[in-house]
Amino acid sequence: MQKLQISVYIYLFMLIVAGPVDLNENSEQKENVEKEGLCNACLWRENTTSSRLEAIKIQILSKLRLETAPNISKDAIRQLLPKAPPLLELIDQFDVQRDAGSDGSLEDDDYHARTDAVITMPTESDLLTQVEGKPKCCFFQFSSKIQYNKLVKAQLWIYLRPVKTPATVFVQILRLIKPMKDGTRYTGIRSLKLDMNPGTGIWQSIDVKTVLQNWLKQPESNLGIEIKALDENGHDLAVTFPEPGEDGLTPFLEVKVTDTPKRSRRDFGLDCDERSTESRCCRYPLTVDFEAFGWDWIIAPKRYKANYCSGECEFVFLQKYPHTHLVHQANPRGSAGPCCTPTKMSPINMLYFNGEGQIIYGKIPAMVVDRCGCS
C-alpha cells in the first residue's frame, strides 16, 4: 500500500513539474499543416497589379514571337500606316475586347498568336533595283505567318492620284520575270479600265490570290511587280513612290488566312470588384493600357480588360476534382493545396506592327480571364 502511495506522489510531482497538458495541441498542428498546404504552389496570388501587368507584357511579346517590342516611333507609324479602306475599316470596326457576358465555355487555345490578316508593305530587293534603267515598284516579302496558313484572300491595293477632268484610266499589274529570249521581262497579272471623276484620289483593289499562291509554292519566281495606271494622255496616276504629302499611300498587299476552330468545355466561377469583401477565389477587373506602356506599335486596341484571379481556395470550396479533398484528408502533408487560377481564358484581336514593319491582324490566345476557379 505504501508503495502505491509513493507511486501516486511521484506521478503528481511529474505533472506539476511538466506543467499542464495542452489538449488542443494536436488540432493546432493539424490546422498549421492545412494552412501550409493551402497554397505553397500558388503564392502568385499575392502579386500586385503592377506585376500582373508586367507578366501580360511578357506574354504578349512571347506569343507574338517577339524578343523585344518593335522600335517604331509615332512619326514612322504615320508614314507607314496605309490610309486605305481595309485598314480604316479594321480600326473603325475593331472589336475592342470587352468584358461581355460569358457562356462559361473553356477554349483550348494554342499558345502563340493566330494570324487572321497580314498587310504587307513593299520592300527593297536586289532583284528589283532597276529594270530598263529605272527603279521599279514593287517587291513583297512574305513571312511564315502567310506561308504556313491557308490562304483565303489576297488583294493588291493601289492609290490613284486625282484627275482634274473626267478621265478613263487603264490599270495594269505586271509581274517581273527572268529575261526571255526575246527580251521580255514582264507578264500580265491583271488589267482593268476605270472611269474617274475630278476630285480626290481613289483606292483600287486587285485580286492577286493566284499569283500569291504561285509565289508561295515557288519563292524564286517572286521577282516583283510593276504597277501602271495611265490616263488618255499617258500620265501615270498610280502612287508607287510617294511624293511629299503622300504618306500612307504606298501600294500594299492585304492577305487573309484562316485557321481551324478549337473545341470548348464548360466551367463557372465567381465575379468580384475591387470593393468586394469576398475572400474566396474570384475574378477581379484589370485594364491593360498599351499607351501607358509606350507601345505605339500596337495599332488597336489601345486598351483591353484582362482581369485576374485572386482569393482563397479551401479544400471543400470549388473543388475541380471531388477526390482531391479525400486525398488531402488522408495525407495533409503530402498534398499541395488548390490554387485560385483562370479556368476560362479567351483571346483578344490585335492589329499591330511586327519587327519587319508589316501590319498584322490576328488573335492572341488566352489573354482575357473569363472565369476563375480552384484547382
Curated annotation (Swiss-Prot):
Glycoprotein found in the keyword field: yes
Chief place where the protein resides: secreted
Record organism: Bubalus bubalis
Transmembrane residue ranges: none
Disulphide linkage map: C272-C282, C281-C340, C309-C372, C313-C374
Entry protein name: Growth/differentiation factor 8
Classification via PROSITE patterns: TGF_BETA_1, TGF_BETA_2
Summary of subunit composition and partner proteins: Homodimer; disulfide-linked. Interacts with WFIKKN2, leading to inhibit its activity. Interacts with FSTL3.
UniProt KW keywords: Cleavage on pair of basic residues, Cytokine, Disulfide bond, Glycoprotein, Growth factor, Heparin-binding, Secreted, Signal
PANTHER family, per the entry: GROWTH_DIFFERENTIATION FACTOR 8, TGF-BETA FAMILY
Recorded name of the encoding gene: MSTN
Localisation: Secreted
